[in-house]
Amino acid sequence: MPNPSNRKGKHSAPGQVNVYAKSNEVIVKITGADTDGTFEVVEENCKPGFQSRAHYHIKAFETFYVFEGSADFQVGDELFHAGRGSCVHIPPGVPHQVTSKEGVRMLMIYSPAGTDGMFAAMHALTQEQLMDAELTRRIALLHDTVMIEQSKDGRGKGTILG
């Protein structure tokens, strides 16, 4: 049953949301707390050369919408090139990895919610801790995310954030 305290709309104006900028700028627009855990909305601005660590989500569906730039999405055995206006949807349990040579600005929707806390936890780490694959793997697992392996060229060594 919905929480009566969440019976209000929410406007996420620039600068009035949770912004995490360790490697990429991650902007949590709508949190799981805002939706009683139903979904969350996150904007991510990835720098040129971005490559996430391969991972999957245990319960969450993840949908990406590309606003600017482009990215390659390895989703299971399929590779999608997504440019401006593209949408990529990934069901729970499907391994995926995102790379972008030129940089990309995208919106991510997770349902159910659960990953927004991971961005805050990763942001609180030192640079040395971010490179600790075991530590970041444990943090990710607490937030519905299973890290699979290091990225092929050594990038994305610690976090889902690249």
Outline where the language-model segments fall.
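Glycine- and acidic-residue-biased ligand/ion/polar-headgroup-sensing regions
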Residues: K59-A71, G76
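Short acidic-glycine-tyrosine-enriched beta hairpin
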Residues: G9-A13, V17, D77-P95
